[in-house]
């Protein structure tokens, strides 16, 4: 018998090991990976916190439930004359109760530890906001870090108490009915006698129910105290947060209900012990009356008193809402100034703002990305996932540029090439970046590259020593490096592959034990069977940079647009990280949050995957709390290496939230807010001539702000009056040097009757211009599709300069959009020209007084035969076809080039 028990126990141990083997292996691999990236303490903190909390909660639940059951068992023993339970039933019941106690305790402990470990750590390590809420005079940290945990524990405890009370009554009724049936009592209307029931339940579990009843009422008391604190998030009034009715009526009722519940808990406990029902009913009725009265009285008060005097009574609460919303979204210190439009822009003004003019963006992100992917991807498995906008010194000159990393898209590998070896051992990394100026295009209207091709052709003056990208936005597969196979680096002009094996220092070594672990973890025996993997091989895991940072610090929110940076000859990724909350008192929610800070910049090495978290907003209490919980995770801003700061950008995701808040919260007067007279909308735009309207995306521009001496990069958004298309303000975020994060708002005077054109009105003006409209119609008639680029509205010397690039796309499947014209507008003038220089020249009469020499030069340029232009274009197309291995197209272009040259040599 003992031998059988041992075998059964051994069988269960083996079965459990097999069932949980993968989870155990996952934990081991996580430990190895976190150690390798330098954040083992972060993982162990989370892991040990969950385990410790699980054990603690399990023991508390198990002991509490076990003690509760034992106390009922004692009552059963004392009252066997009333409830007869045979020995066999006792034995079975004991096993069932033990099993249920174990299961319930495990379930509660598991859910609580996984759901609340972080809240408990936040509670214990909370940092003060040093801002108090206006109703309870408590620091905001209580609402952010402590109230959520209190509320969660309250809900869990209330559910547990109700469950125990219900189970107690059900068990008693079951045993009572079972005994009465066993004794042969008839089942009729007198089967359950209320007096016998009261007496029996008191003997069976009187003390237990008394304690449960008292605890339930104490829970209700705490619940109404929590409801009182939650009035800080009340939606009842004109503005979010506690209203006049909430503070004068509802709050008082909640406090009264809380006090009555405490007193009732004592009365109910004694009443249960004395088998008296009336006091219990009286307490329940009193609490119910108070609950119903609160709803009736507060509703009547709101309708009869507040509605007729709403502006006066709600003014303090509107002011609270305005103050706390601005604080919560970081818009409390916006530098605001009036921007009167004098429209006195001239040639001298443009010369004084030369860098602004030179950096006007005539390339657009969407069209440029399409061109990058068709021309610069080189092979079908390369992809440019996104274009980033940044500023670099191009050959010593401050320039805004487009920059995009060339990554491998494993989904685009040909079916036959999509093997395990290719995906994980050969195609291990992307290659380099392409960079083009935003302010210029080629003669054909294509991006003006300063970095391109493979190997890199770099005329930018920005050095890149190591162009490989092992960690990126599209690197969703693990890579095994330093194997017997060579890693594909880039495609040579000859069509052969250049190879370059990994020379970084990251990755987990593929020892025999580790190969076994990864075979189990990935469910793939190739880790063990592959002869290409050696003991010197390394596995690079979690290479998707967004997934990587989420694995290390999942409690932060991350920007949707990581961007690549060249620094000291290497490639790095920068990701903006946010702290958010939905528990900031009186702050109007935007989506599901009502507090947000861009507190952290994450910098990731594209080759080694080294990931560093830098705190850039040390005044954020949430990030301060996390840094206490996870010492060693975050680094100080002073530790950021030289060369990164000049590429930090104010993030668009954060700015978009702030713009949404500014639509209503730019006002300073509560009366204006109440009347809703000065509400704004983020401006809308159109991408196609007859396309649908869409919300304008804030643009990164290099410009000189009013009153400033130098140009800088600004994130700029345009605001319209609510549900109208005339522009009312410009809102910008600065990001260069010490000005990072400073917000500026330029308001146009509203007293004048003149309309300030928004992006939509500007586009309508373009379509209404007869000259431009004819030109656009002519292009459409020739089978070309006309597309708008990104609209730019640039403030210069109390004037607005409007710029709109126009793209032409041939009506064919694989056509590439080319920037063919630029529309520039100032005041009532609207100019369509081949480039920005010509447009400005016509707009401000640059060249009316120029001498004849310049005119002759221009005429000579214009007299270049069309055949030479065609020859140049055919030559470039032939070279491009050669690089892509398209020899048929190459031959056709060379033949046509020869025909043109013959024609030039033998003119008629």
Curated annotation (Swiss-Prot):
Predominant place of localization: membrane
Domain of life: Bacteria
Keywords, comma-separated and alphabetical: Cell membrane, Membrane, Transmembrane, Transmembrane helix
Organism: Clostridium novyi (strain NT)
Family: Belongs to the UPF0182 family.
Transmembrane segments: 8-28, 47-67, 96-116, 157-177, 209-229, 253-273, 280-300
Protein's name in the database: UPF0182 protein NT01CX_0852
Recorded GO CC terms: extracellular region; plasma membrane
Entries under InterPro entries matching the protein: UPF0182 (IPR005372)
Subcellular location: Cell membrane
Membrane topology: Multi-pass membrane protein
The UniProt record lists the keyword Membrane: yes
């Amino acid at each position: 018998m003992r031998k059988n028990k041992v075998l059964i126990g051994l069988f269960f141990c083996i079965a459990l090991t097999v069932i949980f083997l993968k989870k155990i292996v996952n934990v081991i691999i996580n430990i190895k990976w976190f150690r390798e990236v330098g954040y083992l303490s972060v993982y162990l903190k989370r892991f040990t916190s969950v385990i410790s909390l699980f054990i603690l909660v399990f023991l508390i639940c198990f002991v509490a439930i076990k003690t509760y059951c034992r106390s009922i068992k004692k009552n059963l023993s004392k009252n066997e004359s009333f409830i007869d339970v045979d020995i066999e039933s006792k034995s079975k019941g004991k096993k069932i109760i033990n099993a249920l106690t174990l299961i319930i305790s495990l379930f509660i402990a598991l859910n609580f530890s996984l759901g609340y470990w972080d809240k408990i750590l936040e509670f214990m390590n909370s940092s003060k906001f040093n801002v108090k809420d206006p109703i309870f005079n408590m620091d905001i940290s209580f609402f952010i870090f402590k109230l959520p945990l209190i509320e969660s524990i309250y809900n869990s405890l209330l559910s547990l108490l109700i469950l125990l009370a219900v189970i107690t009554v059900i068990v008693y009724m079951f045993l009572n009915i079972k005994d009465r049936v066993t004794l042969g009592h008839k089942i009729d209307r007198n089967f359950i006698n209320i007096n016998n029931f009261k007496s029996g339940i008191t003997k069976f579990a009187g003390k237990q129910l008394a304690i449960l009843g008292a605890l339930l009422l104490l829970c209700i008391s705490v619940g109404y105290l929590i409801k009182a604190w939650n009035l800080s998030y009340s939606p009842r009034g004109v503005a979010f947060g506690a209203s006049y009715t909430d503070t004068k009526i509802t709050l008082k009722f909640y406090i009264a209900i809380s006090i009555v519940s405490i007193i009732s808990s004592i009365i109910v406990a004694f009443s249960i012990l004395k088998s008296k029902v009336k006091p219990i009913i009286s307490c329940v009725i009193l609490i119910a009356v108070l609950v119903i009265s609160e709803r009736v009285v507060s509703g009547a008060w709101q309708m009869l008193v507040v509605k007729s005097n709403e502006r006066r009574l709600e003014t303090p609460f509107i002011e609270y809402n305005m103050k706390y919303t601005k604080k919560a979204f970081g818009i409390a210190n916006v530098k605001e100034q009036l921007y009167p439009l004098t429209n006195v822009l001239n040639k001298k003004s443009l010369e004084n703002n030369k860098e602004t003019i030179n950096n006007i963006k005539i390339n657009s992100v969407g069209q440029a990305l399409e061109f990058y992917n068709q021309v610069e991807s080189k092979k079908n498995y390369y992809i440019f996932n996104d274009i980033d906008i940044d500023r670099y010194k191009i050959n010593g000159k401050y320039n805004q540029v487009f920059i995009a990393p060339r990554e491998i898209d494993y989904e685009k590998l040909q079916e036959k090439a999509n093997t395990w070896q290719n995906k994980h051992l050969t195609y291990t990394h992307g290659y380099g970046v392409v960079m083009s100026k935003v302010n210029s295009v080629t003669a054909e209207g294509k991006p003006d590259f300063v970095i391109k091709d493979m190997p890199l052709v770099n005329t930018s003056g920005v050095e890149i020593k190591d162009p490989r990208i092992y960690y990126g936005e599209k690197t969703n597969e693990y890579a095994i490096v330093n194997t017997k196979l060579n890693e594909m680096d880039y495609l040579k002009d000859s069509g052969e592959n250049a190879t370059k094996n990994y020379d970084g220092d990251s990755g987990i070594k593929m020892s025999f034990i580790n190969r076994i672990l990864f075979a189990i973890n990935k469910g793939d025996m190739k880790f063990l069977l592959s002869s290409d993997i050696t003991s010197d091989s390394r596995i690079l895991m979690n290479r998707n940079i967004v997934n990587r940072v989420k694995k290390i610090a999942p409690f932060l929110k991350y920007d949707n647009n990581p961007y690549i940076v060249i620094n000291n000859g290497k490639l790095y990724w920068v990701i903006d990280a946010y702290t958010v909350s939905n528990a900031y008192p009186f702050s109007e929610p935007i989506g599901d949050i009502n507090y947000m800070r861009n507190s952290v910049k994450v910098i990731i090495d594209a080759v080694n995957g080294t990931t560093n978290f830098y705190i850039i907003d040390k005044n954020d209490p949430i990030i301060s709390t996390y840094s206490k919980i996870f010492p060693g995770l975050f680094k100080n801003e002073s530790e950021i290496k030289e060369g990164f700061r000049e590429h930090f950008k104010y993030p668009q995701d954060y700015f978009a939230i702030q713009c949404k808040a500014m639509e209503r919260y730019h006002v300073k007067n509560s009366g204006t807010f109440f009347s809703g007279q000065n509400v704004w909308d983020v401006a809308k735009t159109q991408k196609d001539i007859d396309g649908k309207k869409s919300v304008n995306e804030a643009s990164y521009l290099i410009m000189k702000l009013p009153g400033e001496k130098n140009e800088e990069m600004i994130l700029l958004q345009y605001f319209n009056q609510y549900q109208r298309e005339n522009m009312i303000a410009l809102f910008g975020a600065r990001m260069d040097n010490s000005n990072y994060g400073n917000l500026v708002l330029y308001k146009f005077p509203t007293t004048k009757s003149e309309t300030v054109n928004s992006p939509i009105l500007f586009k309508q003006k373009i379509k209404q211009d007869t000259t431009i409209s004819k030109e656009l119609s002519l292009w459409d008639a020739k089978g070309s599709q006309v597309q708008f680029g990104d609209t730019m509205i640039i403030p210069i010397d109390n004037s607005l300069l409007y710029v709109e690039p126009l793209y032409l796309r041939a009506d064919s499947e694989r056509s590439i959009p080319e920037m063919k014209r630029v529309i520039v507008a100032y005041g009532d003038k609207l100019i369509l020209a081949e480039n920005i220089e010509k447009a400005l020249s016509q707009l401000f009469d640059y060249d009316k007084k120029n001498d004849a020499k310049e005119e002759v030069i221009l005429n000579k340029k214009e007299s270049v035969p069309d055949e030479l232009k065609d020859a140049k274009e055919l030559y470039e197309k032939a070279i491009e076809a050669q690089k892509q291995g398209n020899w048929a197209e190459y031959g056709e272009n060379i033949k046509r080039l020869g025909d043109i040259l013959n024609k030039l040599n033998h003119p008629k």
